[in-house]
Curated annotation (Swiss-Prot):
Binds RpoD and negatively regulates RpoD-mediated transcription activation by preventing the interaction between the primary sigma factor RpoD with the catalytic core of the RNA polymerase and with promoter DNA. May be involved in replacement of the RNA polymerase sigma subunit from RpoD to RpoS during the transition from exponential growth to the stationary phase. Keywords: Cytoplasm, Transcription, Transcription regulation. This is Regulator of sigma D. The keyword Transport does not apply. One of its GO terms (biological process) is regulation of DNA-templated transcription.
Length: 153
């Protein structure tokens, strides 16, 4: 995911300050995620959870999702409307998919990440982290498509 981010940053970097800030926030989220999942290199063994890493990831996750929905997507849809009906329609579809993705991630957050982690739910927590990683990868692909639609036209 960091390689994908690097490619997109090189593609659009410097052309739009808002996008640059967004991509930097994505990088911070990915670093926090990798730090958190890297804490348990042996998935079979129970190890102590770094609560600070979990808190950092959760804060970055909520901030990233909120910024996208309440700030960036709206601006991108407005920008798409200035290009063409086709770009606007595709961007609107992407926005709908992103809303569904946010709901999926927040369901994981509410049911697994925000709860206390102990021996009984450690495996479930690790599976939830993996699912969040997959959902983030899907989200980044959707966001990248939206960025390209708006800024290629």
């Amino acid at each position: 995911m960091l390689n994908q981010l690097q490619s997109l940053t090189e593609y659009v970097g410097g052309n739009n300050a808002l996008i640059d800030q967004w991509l930097q926030a994505r990088k911070q989220l990915l670093v926090a995620y990798y730090h958190l999942v890297g804490i348990k290199p042996n998935k079979e063994a129970l190890s102590l959870l770094d609560e600070e890493a979990l808190d950092n990831f959760c804060q970055n996750l909520v901030d990233y999702l909120s910024t996208g929905h309440f700030h960036l997507y709206e601006k991108m849809l407005h920008e798409a409307a200035t290009h063409s009906e086709q770009v606007l329609a595709l961007s609107t579809q992407l926005d709908f998919a992103l809303q569904n993705n946010t709901q999926q991630i927040m369901t994981f957050y509410d049911s697994h990440l925000a709860a206390a982690i102990d021996h009984d739910n450690c495996i479930e927590f690790q599976q939830a982290l993996s699912s969040v990683g997959e959902a983030l990868e899907e989200r980044f692909t959707l966001e990248d498509n939206m960025i390209k639609q708006v800024y290629d036209n």
